[in-house]
Amino acid sequence: MTIKDESESCGSRAVVASPSQENPRHYRMKLDVYSEVLQRLQESNYEEATLPDFEDQLWLHFNRLPARYALDVKVERAEDVLTHQRLLKLAADPATRPVFEVRSVQVSPRISADSDPAVEEDAQSSHQPSGPGVLAPPTFGSSPNFEAITQGSKIVEDVDSVVNATLSTRPMHEITFSTIDKPKLLSQLTSLLGELGLNIQEAHAFSTVDGFSLDVFVVDGWSQEETDGLRDALSKEILKLKDQPGSKQKSISFFEHDKSSNELIPACIEIPTDGTDEWEIDVTQLKIEKKVASGSYGDLHRGTYCSQEVAIKFLKPDRVNNEMLREFSQEVFIMRKVRHKNVVQFLGACTRSPTLCIVTEFMARGSIYDFLHKQKCAFKLQTLLKVALDVAKGMSYLHQNNIIHRDLKTANLLMDEHGLVKVADFGVARVQIESGVMTAETGTYRWMAPEVIEHKPYNHKADVFSYAIVLWELLTGDIPYAFLTPLQAAVGVVQKGLRPKIPKKTHPKVKGLLERCWHQDPEQRPLFEEIIEMLQQIMKEVNVVV
């Protein structure tokens, strides 16, 4: 059982550290940017800059947002900071949010990593506004890491020069949203843009310390350079979502205050049952010991139940809302019927408020994510193949029982004291419907299949894509797309065929397996039964005893 890392959810965005936690170097850089922006606005005689408390309000604005905001913003576009201030102020009014701003922009061609710095400077300066009618650049610069990572993708390499050559000639627009910050808000916004046929080329997402969002997208796909038509289309799309019942009504709720905190939480959570199972635990037999992990919505403790060592995931009473209860119910509903050596064993749950918890077997060696990224350990090929096989067997079992995990990643893979790896965390898993396809996004952008990112119908093959990213992690010990934000990674996966770069010394058949599993077309990805066979064949070739 794992506690999710909220900073890597599908609504992932930067979170502000407290002043005592802030990196001193970042603080100094933020102060420098603030000072330069202030000077430019005052020298340009902006009306806002003449107000008595403007300096304090501007500093407050920078402090509301993460250091990355100051590091990324172009000081030459100091007036854009005023726009962000205005949008955040308007977003405080429930009657007006979500608020947004649209403008046409000029995007410079990307320069390759090995370009001459003088050439790069000349190229960039030649695309800066130089006269009437010339468009300004976007507020934030393109990530220099994005181009470097895409060089590892064959899909991108073949078309990169074409893309770069045409970026500066197509109409581009910058759309900035501000509203209440909510889980999965980014998914809702990207879906909204997709409904209008807009392609996201750059994305920057920030959260304020007081619970608001500032999301900036550079898009193409709108045929006109003017902004009035696009602004009207966005307004109509938002109104359309507000007016529609059912699932889309739920989508637009992400723009509003969370009313669930004011709703009554039932005394007992109803879990569907066929009458043949009994999983409600006797809390008096539960002994709670050391806390081993903590998240925004729950804590994970080590403990014992009827003398058996267990892991106990508690929901935090002060954070419980109806969406959390739905996921809690779903996790219990799925786990109570799951029995496989490569799936974490569910032992029971307490569904009576205020003690809401799920009890599973305790996995002594923790998550694969911690093993790779916190303990800085690595797998040799033989062990890697065994781990990959364990995961494939667990996932094959789930798929045979029509369960799509939807959040497969190394943080949700746990290892016991014998080195056996098991699939865990079914909070967002779903039982596949009869049609074989599902919609609505969940999961984590860095591991998410392109069809899920695009809000297209998807099936169990989405898990196969995530499995490929997991396999790449096992090979490299790195975090996927580490130098991109989760949202930038998502844009790259969908629009540029971005994939992590496979190490040169990778076993050829492991490389082939990776490429099949993360194929853009879900139909071309293998089933887990096939993956098991391929892994077993590779293990024979390298003399691994299964």
From Swiss-Prot:
Gene: STY8
Location of Phosphothreonine modifications: T439
Protein's job: Serine/threonine protein kinase that specifically phosphorylates chloroplast precursor proteins in the cytosol within the cleavable presequences (transit peptides). May be part of a cytosolic regulatory network involved in chloroplast protein import. Does not phosphorylate mitochondrion precursor proteins. Specific for ATP and does not utilize other NTPs. Plays a role in chloroplast biogenesis and differentiation in cotyledons, possibly through phosphorylation of chloroplast preproteins.
Cellular component terms per the entry's GO annotation: cytosol
Disordered: annotated span: 1-21, 111-141
Disruption phenotype: No visible phenotype under normal growth conditions, but the double mutant plants sty8 and sty46 show retarded growth.
Entry binding sites for ATP: V292, A293, S294, G295, S296, Y297, G298, D299, L300, K313
Ranges for domain ACT: 174-249
Superkingdom, natural source: Eukaryota
Protein name, per record: Serine/threonine-protein kinase STY8
UniProt organism field: Arabidopsis thaliana (Mouse-ear cress)
GO molecular function: ATP binding; protein serine kinase activity; protein serine/threonine kinase activity; protein serine/threonine/tyrosine kinase activity
InterPro entries linked to this entry: ACT-like_dom_sf, ACT_dom, Kinase-like_dom_sf, Prot_kinase_dom, Ser-Thr/Tyr_kinase_cat_dom, Ser/Thr_kinase_AS, Ser/Thr_Kinases-Pseudokinases
Regulation: Activated by autophosphorylation at Thr-439.
PROSITE patterns listed in its UniProt record: ACT, PROTEIN_KINASE_DOM, PROTEIN_KINASE_ST
